[in-house]
Amino acid sequence: MPNSSESALPVGRSLLYLIVAGIAWGTAGAAASLIFRVSDMGPLALSFWRCVGGLVLLLGALALRPRRAVARTAGESRGRRTARILGTGIGLNVFQSAYFAAVQDTGLAVGTVVTLGAGPVLIAVGARLTMGERLGRGGLLAAGGALAGLAVLVLGGGAAEVRPLGVILAVVAASGYAAITLLTRWLGRDGGATDALATTTWAFAIGAVGLLPSAAAEGLVPHTGSPMRVVLLLVYVAAVPTALAYALYFAGAAVVRAATVSVIMLLEPVSAALIAVSLLGERLTAAIVLGTLLLLAAVTGLAFAEARTAAVRRREEAAESVAV
């Protein structure tokens, strides 16, 4: 979710923020997997508590930030701000709940790789269908590579490692992520300033309210023999891969090019896969490795294609300004 507000952060610090955010997001699924192992908490209840915890911490961040940061982002109309908050909140609900369900069903490595690999491709296709953005040859090749990677994961993984339902849930999660990004891009086409921190905070509030009925039906308080461990894991999910990671991501994404952000965010599925194998005992088959490489190559291809397109656009704009 890009942030179009201005930032005075140096590029080096912004890159560091994005790297930390990507690695932190990669640990969210690992924490969820541990919660599922030691309790009967479901993905909807976990998403609810993540929204509630993230909301509390982000409200604190809003209260502590300088007033001049608010003044720089006061230009967005109430209608557009409401649409952004509602859309982001609903998208977060779909994204988080489906992602945690995918991790529960098919494991951390596959669930994360499919979600983060399919997301950028769905964004590229969605931008073509809804806003007329050209895919180009690189985009088409990336989409084909992503589909091939998904096919390898589903058809070649084996029932013990890859479950089709989990892959479908991961694609649903990717769709929620893509919808948030496309909405943000569509609303930001006029280049107006937005308050990304406030939008995210109230989106988590919408998410918590929307998830409450289904999470209550699933069971808000899990049965577990290790209640303190579950509480600590929930606090971690709310603090590190939610409040901290989102704050760092928005600060860094305001400075770094979108193509570079896409490549750096590949740290999320990579770190999740490393945690899954080294700490959670998940097994990586040849099919999982091949499917993962195809998905990551597709995202990298999209990022470089976007960088080339942006460079051509800048040269054309520079030529037009000289001609005038």
Regions found by a protein language model. Name each.
Residues 1-49, 54, 94, 98, ...:
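Glycine-/small-residue-enriched transmembrane alpha-helix faces in small-molecule transporters
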Residues 62, 119-144, 270-289:
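C-terminal transmembrane-helix exit sites in multi-pass transporters
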Residues 26, 30, 52, 59, ...:
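Hydrophobic/small/kink-forming positions within alpha-helical transmembrane segments
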Residues 35, 46, 50, 102, ...:
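Hydrophobic/aromatic residues within transmembrane alpha-helices
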Residues 12-17, 45-63, 142-144, 165-172, ...:
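Hydrophobic alpha-helical transmembrane segments of multi-pass integral membrane proteins
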